[in-house]
């Protein structure tokens, strides 16, 4: 799967100052990651001293890690300079945090890390990678013995209401439907590709349903999050778009809102 990183970086940079107002699901996912990390390390003798936060965005997960592990040093990496600027303000330029602009796929591919980490975390990031499973495998060498890699990402049922509505609209119009948005790996696919690479692998899957007043509001919120990337090369006609919205409303509207499903995966890997 090819992801145009320049397009991704541009979208998130434009949304950097709006992101914290609309990223409700991503914040819940960050909180859940730290909860899982706390549970995993409950019986550990030592707290993590070195943490890598991949795709730190506006620093929400970075702050959560600082709360749980105040003595740790954190390297926070993101593709977007604008996101990093917001993150630095959000953590009040904490002396234990170093912000690094970069593409984690290039970083792990081009040179080994000069340091290793007790914990590597990534919240709602790996769906934006060209080769997510290969990158996770390469990150294995960045972990200390018994180190933890814990990440969240989205599964294939994410926005299934939207994709279903597009498919039905395409069928009614007699056109070929191209999936819009990203192709997400399933829990089974992650397990199959990561089995054997780590001493321990655990994957949790949880569904989150967000409610919106209209389909338009839902799509506008996704745009504010910077998550409007599409692999489809075909322009979206006004007729196709309008019919999709009508079908979405007819099939999924409750009394006062329409739902959007987020299929959340939480993956814990121990070296």
Swiss-Prot record:
Per the record, the pathway is: Cofactor biosynthesis; biotin biosynthesis
SUPFAM superfamilies membership: S-adenosyl-L-methionine-dependent methyltransferases
Claim: Transcription is one of the keywords in the record: no
Its family?
Belongs to the methyltransferase superfamily.
Q: Which NCBIfam families would you find in this protein's record?
A: BioC
Protein name in the entry? Malonyl-[acyl-carrier protein] O-methyltransferase
Mention one GO biological process in which this protein takes part, according to its record. Answer: methylation
